[in-house]
């Protein structure tokens, strides 16, 4: 009698559900996955090596391009590592601005995730709803940094500039009538802080809309419940972090366990799952959006009442003001020197980790006393999660592989780096 053999299937890198350039070699018995072998490296850009030939400040934009959905949180890990080596104090206002933008970035990431994950599974409407809200937050990015995605807003010692007093408004055009324009600019008459406040006042209702579409949806539950189960013990052994480990019932969050900036002064909860399946990880991320709203509201309240500097007064690191530069020759020379030669960081090594929307994002920085890093190592959360894909997918159907890739929230910028 003829022997039945397993067959091999290439999933990606051109597959729309492969989240970028994932090539997954699946060994199948009928439609059941026996083995899943991820092939990475198709988006490798040598970020760690490039950083060795750039000054410390020139590498900030490279961080944006790692996980290109959670831009500012990547920058945060990098500048924290530099600040540890320099031993400089960051002004309190800058710390609150950083925390506020970390949470804005977390919401941006989770909106992209919920839209793409639902789209992969077959629910198209959520994607359109999620992008409606992302647009507002992208406008906030643009208001503070001039760029919608790659902001390069954080600086060693603080942030590039304070929150602007006026929120940019939409201009009249052929495709918009006056009524539509007035509606679009409704919340944009005040400052950037007013706009963010207005957004986070409206946002919980939007999260309710996503939950109405998904949480009790019979098809959604059939596709997610009991899929990709990871036990708490195994989650620890696999090195999972972020929503992946919290979905398995372990309340591990760097914002609580190893607080950085002002997270120890802010009141919020860590959502955890019970069963460790895709559905629990979905619920954890949805609740994280609500907690980010709480954190953002507290930051806004503090920032309204406490004006102050947003970058350190250490002039070895911080550039002079734009106004001073245009009137004072010494300031101009100082600015030129700082951006051509850069600042020198004392010899030593430091590890800084932040609670990234996807997990623990760490930067290990080694300095030999020069104006460039001697070695920069990036600890990307997605790398450990993708390593667990084989174990999570075994025994499931081929259609469930898409759900598992979606629940891991894979972005290849940080995995291949």
UniProtKB/Swiss-Prot annotation:
Gene Ontology MF term list: NAD binding; NADH:ubiquinone reductase (non-electrogenic) activity; quinone binding
Keyword Translocase assigned: yes
InterPro entries: NADH_Q_OxRdtase_suD, NADH_UbQ_OxRdtase_49kDa_CS, NDH1_su_D/H, NiFe-Hase_large
Record key words, sorted: Cell inner membrane, Cell membrane, Membrane, NAD, Quinone, Translocase, Transport, Ubiquinone
Record Gene3D superfamilies: Cytochrome-c3 Hydrogenase, chain B
Stated role: NDH-1 shuttles electrons from NADH, via FMN and iron-sulfur (Fe-S) centers, to quinones in the respiratory chain. The immediate electron acceptor for the enzyme in this species is believed to be ubiquinone. Couples the redox reaction to proton translocation (for every two electrons transferred, four hydrogen ions are translocated across the cytoplasmic membrane), and thus conserves the redox energy in a proton gradient.
Family: Belongs to the complex I 49 kDa subunit family.
Name this polypeptide is given: NADH-quinone oxidoreductase subunit D
């Amino acid at each position: 009698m003829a022997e039945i053999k397993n067959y091999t299937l290439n999933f990606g890198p051109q597959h729309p559900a492969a989240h970028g350039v994932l090539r997954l070699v699946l060994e199948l018995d009928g439609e059941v996955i026996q083995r899943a072998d991820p092939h990475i490296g198709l988006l490798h850009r040598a970020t760690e090596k490039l950083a060795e030939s750039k000054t410390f400040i020139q590498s900030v934009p490279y961080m944006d391009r790692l996980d290109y959905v959670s831009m500012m949180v990547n920058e945060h890990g990098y500048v924290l590592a530099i600040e540890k080596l320099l031993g400089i104090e960051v002004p309190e206002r800058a710390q609150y601005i950083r925390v506020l933008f970390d949470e804005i970035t977390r919401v941006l990431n989770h909106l992209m995730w919920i839209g793409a994950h639902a789209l992969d599974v077959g629910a198209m409407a959520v994607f359109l709803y999620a992008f409606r809200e992302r647009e507002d937050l992208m406008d906030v990015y643009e208001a503070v940094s001039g760029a919608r995605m790659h902001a390069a807003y954080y600086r060693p010692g603080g942030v590039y500039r304070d929150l602007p007093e006026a929120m940019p408004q939409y201009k009249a055009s052929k495709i918009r009538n006056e009524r539509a324009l007035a509606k679009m600019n409704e919340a944009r008459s005040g400052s950037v802080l007013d706009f963010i406040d207005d957004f986070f006042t409206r946002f919980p209702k939007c999260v309710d809309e996503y939950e109405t579409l998904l949480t009790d949806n019979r098809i959604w539950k059939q596709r997610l419940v009991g899929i990709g189960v990871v036990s708490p013990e195994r989650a620890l052994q696999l090195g999972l972090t972020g929503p992946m480990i919290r979905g398995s019932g372990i309340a591990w969050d760097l914002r609580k366990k190893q607080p950085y900036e002002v997270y120890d002064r802010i009141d919020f909860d860590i959502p955890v799952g019970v069963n460790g399946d895709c559905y629990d990880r979905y619920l954890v991320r949805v609740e994280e959006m609500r907690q980010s709203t709480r954190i953002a509201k507290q930051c806004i309240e503090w920032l309204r009442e406490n004006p102050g500097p947003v970058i350190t007064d250490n002039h070895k690191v911080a550039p002079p003001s734009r106004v001073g530069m245009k009137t004072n020759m010494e300031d101009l020379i100082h600015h030129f020197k700082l951006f051509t030669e850069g600042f020198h960081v004392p010899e030593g090594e430091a590890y800084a980790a932040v609670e990234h929307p996807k997990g623990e994002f760490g930067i290990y920085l080694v300095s030999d006393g020069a104006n460039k890093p001697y070695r920069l190592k990036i600890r990307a959360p997605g790398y450990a999660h993708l390593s667990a894909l084989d174990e999570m997918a075994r025994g499931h159907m081929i259609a469930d592989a898409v759900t598992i890739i979606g629940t891991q929230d894979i972005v290849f910028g940080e995995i291949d780096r």
